[in-house]
């Protein structure tokens, strides 16, 4: 290993394959899996890593647009030491996201396949003992249309905090979301895959040193939305015990406004499956090749497909479930970043607002174009411009303020409303706002953007311990965030000795500002929530409401 030590002397991580003397082999309910040991500098106990462990049958043929089924058993020792293919998606955009948010040093080979229901496991446990460590299950983001498990290395988080980290995959885009609005294709296949992965964890994680009675689900963006959908789903009862939503909750997506049949009809027309019945349409789409569906995906407006109120995963709208308090009231961390629309989202959307300047007329026409996504009627646009843009005459500042408005509508306000509902139902709730610019982000990003969408991921996964270039300040911030997240996974409370106090989100609405300075504050987005609540109460948007039959 001297060569490894010499070549990578400047790095914080040096993988040592086959250490201890033989690689780890673990029994699952379906068969044995072979992993590999990876050591992190400063830790005597290596992390056992298992990549591409199947948790369901490949969702092919008749299982396309159908609930996942348990994997078939195998009689040999399955080699799980290479990254699995990511679920089918637009490869160009998928690579862009993976490059931007990859938390580890290792280059992840980007392969895509419809056969993708796999998970990765990082366990610091001595597998010869009954360790029962807390388990943290990561649900990746990417708008439910792109992304995968492997860009998120659980190596540093598992080693530093002595937790078992599991990163899961789920069907994306048309494969994960296609719904006819009836029993022929109810939709929410992505969430059913997530539930199948959590059931697999319940049945198997003890043999990897994890405690099935201490499972925390955490995710970012669409992963955060998924976490909150699972909290609201009766199907997820007892599958997890704590939850963390980073930059996304299910209230973000206006699910009760989605016209499922119209979207299905558009897909049918574009695909040439324009049949008279739902059953025939589904049958026709099942005959399409993966490449044909991928071509269809690229043609589709990505915002047209989403989680639906299917009567199964979600029996009612999120708002109704929260009002009735009929959900899994587990301890919950909810948070978002200071500038969610700072750079990465506008870039992924094709350089949204590429002009460096903005005036009221431009803002008004822009808001009209996006009014369906914002769930607003056009009549309220003047009030929004008055609230957000009138405080300055600087056209560059006006653009920043308009992006702040998008951050509020899509992230800040839904997070606060969700947290209030969780609190009122008796779930121990903690809120944060992340305010830091990681050193690992693209050089193309403006220096002024602090706390962009996805920035907290580098701290959560301990990237300063896996990649070179982090300052002492950034390294310490990552230690702090990992400690908060892991304490919460252990105890349902992020607080611990030597940490800044994180207040519970109660009627005082205390929260934590996390960044170069980490401190308590109160009433996160309180003024903005009051503005939007009053505005929408007086001017409800005229949109269609469809549910499954």
From Swiss-Prot:
Catalytic site:
221 (acyl-ester intermediate), 340 (charge relay system), 453 (charge relay system)
The short motif Prevents secretion from ER is annotated over 546-549
Q: Which reaction does it catalyse?
A: a carboxylic ester + H2O = an alcohol + a carboxylate + H(+)
Name one process (GO BP) from the record: lipid catabolic process
Known EC number(s)? 3.1.1.1
Residues recorded as bearing Phosphoserine in the entry: 471
Provide the family line.
Belongs to the type-B carboxylesterase/lipase family.
Q: What is this protein called?
A: Carboxylesterase 1C
Gene name per UniProt: Ces1c
């Amino acid at each position: 290993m001297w060569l490894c030590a010499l070549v990578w002397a400047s790095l914080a991580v040096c993988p040592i394959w086959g250490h201890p003397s033989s690689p780890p082999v673990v029994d699952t309910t379906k068969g044995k899996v072979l992993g590999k040991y990876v050591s992190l500098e400063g830790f005597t106990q290596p992390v056992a890593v298992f990549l591409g462990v199947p948790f369901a049958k490949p969702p092919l043929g008749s299982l396309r647009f159908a609930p996942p089924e348990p994997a078939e058993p195998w009689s040999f020792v399955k080699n799980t030491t290479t990254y699995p293919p990511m679920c089918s998606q637009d490869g160009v955009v998928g690579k862009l996201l993976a490059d931007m948010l990859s938390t580890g040093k290792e280059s992840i080979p980007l392969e895509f396949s419809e056969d993708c229901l796999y998970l990765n496991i990082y366990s610091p446990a001595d597998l010869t003992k009954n360790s029962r460590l807390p388990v943290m299950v990561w649900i990746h983001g990417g708008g439910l249309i792109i992304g995968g498990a492997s860009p998120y290395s659980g190596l540093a988080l598992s080693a530093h905090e002595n937790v078992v980290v599991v990163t899961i995959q789920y069907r994306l885009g048309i494969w994960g979301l296609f719904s006819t609005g009836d029993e022929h294709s109810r939709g929410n296949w992505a969430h059913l895959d997530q539930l199948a992965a959590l059931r697999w964890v319940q049945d198997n994680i003890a043999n990897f040193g994890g405690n099935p009675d201490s499972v925390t689900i955490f995710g970012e963006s669409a992963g955060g939305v998924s976490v909150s959908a699972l909290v609201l789903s009766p199907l997820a009862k007892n599958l997890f015990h704590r939850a963390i939503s980073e930059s996304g909750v299910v209230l973000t997506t206006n699910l009760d406004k989605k016209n499922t049949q119209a979207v299905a009809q558009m897909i049918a027309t574009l695909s040439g499956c324009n049949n008279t019945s739902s059953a025939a349409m589904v049958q026709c789409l099942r005959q399409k090749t993966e490449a044909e569906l991928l071509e269809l995906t690229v043609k589709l407006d990505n915002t047209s497909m989403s989680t639906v109120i299917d009567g199964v995963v979600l029996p009612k709208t999120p708002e109704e479930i929260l009002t009735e308090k009929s959900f899994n009231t587990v301890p919950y961390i909810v948070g978002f970043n200071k500038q969610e629309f700072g750079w990465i989202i506008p870039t992924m959307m094709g350089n949204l607002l590429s002009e460096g300047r903005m005036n009221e007329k431009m803002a008004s026409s822009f808001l009209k174009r996006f009014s369906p996504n914002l769930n607003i009627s056009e009549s309220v646009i003047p009030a929004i411009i008055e609230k957000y843009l009138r405080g300055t005459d600087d056209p560059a500042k006006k653009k920043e303020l308009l992006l702040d408005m998008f951050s509020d509508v899509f992230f800040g306000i839904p997070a606060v409303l969700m947290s209030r509902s969780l609190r009122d139902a008796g779930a121990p709730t903690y809120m944060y706002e992340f305010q830091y610019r990681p050193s690992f982000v693209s050089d193309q990003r403006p220096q002024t953007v602090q706390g962009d969408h996805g920035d907290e991921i580098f701290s959560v996964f301990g990237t300063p311990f896996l990649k070179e270039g982090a300052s002492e300040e950034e390294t310490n911030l990552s230690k702090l965030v990992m400690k908060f997240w892991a304490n919460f996974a252990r105890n349902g409370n992020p607080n611990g000795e030597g940490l800044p106090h994180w207040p519970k989100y109660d009627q005082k609405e205390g929260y934590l500002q996390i960044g170069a300075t980490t401190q308590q504050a109160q009433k996160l987005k309180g003024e903005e929530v009051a503005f939007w609540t009053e505005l929408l109460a007086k001017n409800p948007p005229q949109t269609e409401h469809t549910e499954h039959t």
